[in-house]
């Protein structure tokens, strides 16, 4: 049951990332259906068993989605190794690679504003997962989302 909930949770993340991309891309006058969607995923620590399992589920669900929808899903996954500066650099790399969406498992939830500024500058939607950024940061832009459980529960 627990694995099913994890799978469902992260299927929501991957489909949410693609839906975000499509939603905002379709507003552009030069929009055409994508052949691929590139998603940058930065993890606070890949050695964490739970986070590692999340990553594997994301990769599996992306492959399933690719097969059913015919749109190539490119997942760039990086491990920040519990270092916020490393994670910030990874986001820079994702943006330089032209990622359509970034998904972030924050090292330091109070440092999300740096990543948000970078995403806003490039008009790239962001999904934060598992560790919720400070609400003031999430409310700064309509292209920012959090997927995860309420930590108080």
Give the ranges of each region predicted by the language model.
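Helix C-cap/helix->beta junction micro-motif
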Residues: 65, 69, 122-124
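Hydrophobic membrane-insertion alpha-helices, especially the h-region
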Residues: 8-21
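Ser/Thr/Pro/Gly-rich low-complexity linker/stalk segments immediately outside membranes or between
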Residues: 25-39
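Positively charged n-region of N-terminal signal peptides that target proteins for export
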Residues: 1-6
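Hydrophobic alpha-helical
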Residues: 58, 102-121
